[in-house]
UniProtKB/Swiss-Prot annotation:
GO terms for biological process: 5-phosphoribose 1-diphosphate biosynthetic process; capsule polysaccharide biosynthetic process; cell wall organization; purine nucleotide biosynthetic process; ribonucleoside monophosphate biosynthetic process. This is Ribose-phosphate pyrophosphokinase. It catalyses: D-ribose 5-phosphate + ATP = 5-phospho-alpha-D-ribose 1-diphosphate + AMP + H(+). Mg(2+) 2 binds at residue 178. Optimum pH is close to 8. Activities at pH 7 and pH 9.5 are 57% and 70% of the maximal activity, respectively.
Amino acid sequence: MSHDWTDNRKNLMLFAGRAHPELAEQVAKELDVHVTSQDAREFANGEIFVRFHESVRGCDAFVLQSCPAPVNRWLMEQLIMIDALKRGSAKRITAVMPFYPYARQDKKHRGREPISARLIADLLKTAGADRIVTVDLHTDQIQGFFDGPVDHMRGQNLLTGYIRDNYPDGNMVVVSPDSGRVRIAEKWADALGGVPLAFIHKTRDPRVPNQVVSNRVVGDVAGRTCVLIDDMIDTGGTIAGAVALLHNDGAGDVIIAATHGVLSDPAAQRLASCGAREVIVTNTLPIGEDKRFPQLTVLSIAPLLASTIRAVFENGSVTGLFDGDA
């Protein structure tokens, strides 16, 4: 790739935290740039130190950090990197967050609870971020929490493209894991050729994390290949329960597709044994060998992130990269 797109009046610099170096290198390769060298380490008490090895004055900085477990460690590292760039006189700082942490805490379910997703946005702004690039937020309203531009990218085109190429049979139905994601499921159904929809009616106890009671399937899934979608898979309990419900209703193959593979224990074991034909996620988060299983397919989100970074750098349109809301 040439540097024809580079605006000589500015200097694009890519910075990466230590949480997901493989993704950072993939993005750098797509952009034909290098990840800026830095010294990042912990002191004995766990405090994080970061120093960049070259001048950042006047640069257009993109700070890439995923937030797998331990989430707070990697989030704090990104905040410290942003602060260092601000104090080093970077011209503009964009926080590239493939997976936005604390996104499930986007509203108060009961009294005396925090809205942690808003707090994260405030912390990023205070640290010095001018802009956020992220992928498939848990809810769209989080875009409004940040006082600045938010480029909310979608993994849908990547995932639906893979499904179209590998499952050409038209006898398919898109299944939303709950009624709240039906609008997104409609977009999936259109992308897969106008296939029908179904959804899982479920209840959740807000006092018990990672626990959902799946009740019944609404829609006709008998004999069909079911594409069960979600934004993330954490412990896998919800999605595994949904697979069982679909099979009980006579579904054929069940394909699970989600953007974020959090895969907290015991997700790998649950997904491997739940009866799904394939589990498709992207690499917004690192997925170690201990979390992999035969049915798992991991697609690279790097081309989408790189295209977004390039568009932001050129002050171009991000909306043209996908059919979304950026």
